Every structure is written in structure tokens, then in C-alpha cells.
Amino acid sequence: MRKFANMKLFALLLFPFLVQAQTHNTAKDLLNDVYEHTLTLETQHIVFTNTIGAPSNGGMKERASKGELFALGEKVRVKTDAFEFLSDGSKAYLIYPEDEEIETTASDEETSLSPADILKNYQSGYSYKMAGKAQEKGKTIQYVALRPVASEEVKEILIGIDVKSLLLENYSQYGTNGVKTVFSVDSYEVNIPLDKEMFNINSSEFEGFYRL
């Protein structure tokens, strides 16, 4: 009887840790499912809002900007008011249309805003947990909270997933310095026709641009 009581007590003590591990795995599996689903898409067109908030005089000062993202397989092009980002699958570029300049930059997932690259960044080095659901714009959004195992800059990341479509809905990063960065999807189209030339850095669109 005492042995049974001790085992029961041990199970009660262990239960919170088992639940935490299960939640961790469920959240990570969901992110992996969304990542795998995103890879199956032939093309993507996303209109988004990017908002950066920073502490200022006891409050938060925010700056928002609109942009568009086009993806064709591994090729990505992001258009914003200030600059464009283009990755042709092997090299990445920053494009400044007003100055007619093109700068070669690092070609890795961290420089891209594509949903697949955002999700790929967080496949390891984080703890994961389900962070509740919300009804937004007629959609059911499941949130997943991530905490880096070792980071002096990032405190927490919150990723919102459209439960029905398994597509990225929003992404928020909270810095240890109080800065908050939010990527919100305004519209998301998949498998629509896209011109392959828009991912060609040597196309006539960039004729005469100065290469830095």
C-alpha cells in the first residue's frame, strides 16, 4: 500500500513535466507540418504589414510599413517602400529602385521573409508550447510560443498559424531590449501564375542598375 502511495505521489510530481513535454512536441509538430505544407506550394503571393515597436519616453513608438512577397519554389522576392530583396535560389540581393543600385548580400534563411524560411529558422534551438487560439478576420489562429535556448537578444517569438489552411498568419519577435517586431499577413494567395523573370537579377528590369 505504501509502495502504491509512493508511486502515485511520484506520478503526480512527474505529471506537469510530462504535460510540458507533450505540449512541446505538439507545438513543434504543428510548425513542422506548416513548414512541410509550405514547401509543397508552387507559388505564393503575400501582402503584409511589418511593424517595429521600440520603447520611447515610457511608451512604445511604432513604425509600420507595407510590402509584398512573391515566392516561386526556392526563389523569393520581397518589395517594400525602401528596398527590395531578391533571392534566385543561389544568391541574394538588396535592390534600391530609387537609386538604381543592387547589392549582393548573404543568401540564407535569416535574410528572407518567406514563410518557409521563417519556420525553418526555428526547427531547433528553441522550446515550444501551444499558446492558445484566437478568432481573427474570420479565421481560427493557433499560436505557438517559442523561447530560445540561448540568446541574449531574443526573449520570445510568437507564431500564428491559420488552422484551416496551415499557412503562416503572423509572426512576432520580442527582444530583450524591449523592441517588438511583427509580420502580419494581409492577404495570402497560393499557386497563382507568376512571371519567372521577376526573380532574374539580370532581367531587363534592372538594366543600367549600378552593382555595388
Please state what every model-predicted region is.
Residues 66-113, 181:
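An acidic-aromatic
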Residues 28-30, 46, 119-130, 183:
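A short, amphipathic edge element
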Residues 13, 19-61, 70-75, 205-212:
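N-terminal leader/targeting segments and the immediate start of mature chains
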Residues 131-133, 137-211:
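Gly/Pro-enriched, hydrophobic low-complexity segments
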Residues 1-10:
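Bacterial N-terminal signal peptides that target proteins for export
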Residues 65-66, 71-72, 86-88, 157-170:
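A short, surface-exposed beta-strand/turn
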Residues 107-139:
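Flexible, surface-exposed loop/linker segments and immediately adjacent secondary-structure boundaries
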